Amino acid sequence: MGGSELEELKKYITNIPDFPAKGIIFRDVTSLLQSGEGFSAAVDEMLKQLDDIEFDAVLGLEARGFLFGAPVAYAKKKSFVPVRKKGKLPRATVSAEYELEYGKAEVEIHTDSLKKGDKVVIIDDLIATGGTLEAAAKLVEQLGAEVVRIVCLIELTDLKGREKLKKYDVRSIVNYEGK
């Protein structure tokens, strides 16, 4: 897909003004998921972002990162590692904190989900402030693995999440200005 074709993906993403708060435009990917053509195009574009690298596993962030990460892992015949909110995984885990607007939250993965030296791709639907993605990268590094790329469908460029992730190779498919 070229630039204009990538912009075509935007037609599948519904913009919801003033949600969850006044002045915010929510970029709703569920409308993209409801379109076989849109969903396929989005996953295909994510796959293209990985053609030039070798990797062992795909890490997907709860919850919408699962929706894009799992098909990418399947297509590339790689393992899929779910990043969950703290307390949702049944076996031994490692965790990492990240900042919320008012407080902190934690995400975790199983300690046996990655091996030392594994090369990992992180997939999510959206880069906003970058906090959750940064926490996911820390989980990978705690287990001695390496983040080789981060791929997201949407980037909210005005929130400058990419700055928090500057030590990583970050790719986004479509960009939006504003919050």
PLM feature spans:
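Active-site-facing substrate-recognition patch
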Residues: 2-55
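Short, glycine/charge-rich flexible loops or terminal/linker lids adjacent to PRPP-binding catalytic cores
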Residues: 79-121
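Conserved acidic residues
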Residues: 56, 118, 148
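PRPP-dependent phosphoribosyltransferase catalytic core
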Residues: 5, 11, 135-179
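Conserved SAM/SAH-binding loop-helix junction
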Residues: 67, 131, 135
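Conserved PRPP/pyrophosphate-binding segment of the phosphoribosyltransferase/PRPP-pathway fold
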Residues: 44-97
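Conserved G/P- and acidic residue-centered "switch" motifs that form tight phosphate/ATP-binding loops
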Residues: 125, 130
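Generic enzyme active-site microenvironment
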Residues: 60, 122-123
